[in-house]
Amino acid sequence: MSKRDTMIRALCKSLGVDYRVTTIDLERVIYRDFGNGFNVEISGMHTSSMKKKATIYLWYGDTMTECIIVKTVRDIPRELIGENVEELMKYSNLLIAQGYDSYDKLFRLKYGKTINYAGGVKNMTHRIF
C-alpha cells in the first residue's frame, strides 16, 4: 500500500465510522452520506503531504442524472475537516426544513431558475449539466 493510501485511510478512520474511502471521478476521496439526500465528498486528501488542504463538496442526489453540487468549501486544513462536514450537515438539514428537498428546487436555488433551451417550445425545459 502506498503512503498516500495509508494517509487517506488514516484520515478517514480519524473522522469516524460514517466516512469511507471511495473513488469519484477517478480520484480517491473520502465520502459521507448524511442519509437525508445530501452527501459530502472530501477531495484532495489522497496525498502524502500533511499540509495539503481539502476541498469539500456538498452534493444532493445519488445518481448521475440527479446530482447537483450545492456548496463547495475550499482550503480546509486536515484538522478542520470534521468540523466543516458537521456544519455542512446542519446546512443540508436547514435546506430541507426550508423546502429545498429535490434536485429541481436546489437547481432553482443555485441558478435562479430553470432555463428553457428548447427553442421556444412552451413548457419544455432542460437541465444544464
Locate the predicted segments by residue.
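Negatively charged, low-complexity tracts enriched in Asp/Glu with abundant Ser/Thr
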Residues: 1-37, 53, 59-129
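A short acidic-to-branched-hydrophobic micro-motif
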Residues: 40-44
